[in-house]
Amino acid sequence: MRIADYSVTKAVLERHGFTFKKSFGQNFLTDTNILQKIVDTAEIDDQVNVIEIGPGIGALTEFLAERAAQVMAFEIDHRLVPILADTLRDFDNVTVVNEDILKVDLAQHIQNFKNPDLPIKVVANLPYYITTPILMHLIESGIPFCEFVVMMQKEVADRISAQPNTKAYGSLSIAVQYYMTAKVAFIVPRTVFVPAPNVDSAILKMVRRPEPAVAVEDENFFFKVSKASFTHRRKTLWNNLTGYFGKTEEVKDKLTKALDQAGLSPSVRGEALSLAEFAGLADALKGQGL
């Protein structure tokens, strides 16, 4: 029997008198086939260390611990710590850290792996209400995670993996794809969770690029420009950028020159631009002193 078997999950929750906290976005997976697929998608073996976020009662952790060198699981809910100590008692390669992943000194914790030089993968069922902040925090942490295989709301997975000229494409697509390749591995129906969420989920596989997707003079400025370009999706690049930089004649003159230099029409919308085109635009705007 597995932790994720519905009868086991139910028994564990009842034994410990556990009640779900909506504020933590807790939805526990009760489908062993899907858990197996997640671990297979992540290609976990004994030459990999794993960071897990939000282990719950250890359903995914169990599958990870059977294959990984070590698993470090970050759980914000202190009520789950004794439950995890119970459900994962047979594993000596799991460490549960009762901390908020957004506040913890992750670099310090990673040194506690027995072999911190092994590649590190992030495999997690992320809380829906805080998926994007957690992902961006980890991607921008400077820690060389080689891969992420994470469950999230399907709509967010679609946005992250979206290509130009699609409805889902936006500043989040650019922010993630600058660092990683991103592809939806498979869809997870809402019916396999306790309690069932209101939406379907997706497993997103992201692999770190050896170098960022495009070369830019100023990364922060590049992200600001891409974000500003999507402020109002239905507006043109010109309208969004004058809304961001200002509408003085000087700004308009510089903006005209930058767009011309980048080979872009003022009437194009942000969703039509590739990462390379955003890079060219950001560098041209920077060159104009904007």
Swiss-Prot record:
**What GO terms fall under cellular component here?**
cytosol
- Reactions mediated catalytically: adenosine(1518)/adenosine(1519) in 16S rRNA + 4 S-adenosyl-L-methionine = N(6)-dimethyladenosine(1518)/N(6)-dimethyladenosine(1519) in 16S rRNA + 4 S-adenosyl-L-homocysteine + 4 H(+)
What GO molecular-function term can you cite, just one? Answer: RNA binding
Tell whether Transcription regulation is among the UniProt keywords: no
Enzyme Commission number(s) of this protein: 2.1.1.182
- List the CDD domains: AdoMet_MTases
Enumerate the residues binding S-adenosyl-L-methionine: 27, 29, 54, 75, 100, 125
| Record flagged with keyword Signal | no
Q: Which UniProt keywords apply?
A: Cytoplasm, Methyltransferase, RNA-binding, rRNA processing, S-adenosyl-L-methionine, Transferase
> Where in or outside the cell is it found?
Cytoplasm
- Family indicated by similarity: Belongs to the class I-like SAM-binding methyltransferase superfamily. rRNA adenine N(6)-methyltransferase family. RsmA subfamily.
| Function noted in UniProt | Specifically dimethylates two adjacent adenosines (A1518 and A1519) in the loop of a conserved hairpin near the 3'-end of 16S rRNA in the 30S particle. May play a critical role in biogenesis of 30S subunits.
Q: What is this protein called?
A: Ribosomal RNA small subunit methyltransferase A
Species this chain originates from: Streptococcus pneumoniae serotype 4 (strain ATCC BAA-334 / TIGR4)
Q: Encoded by which gene? A: rsmA
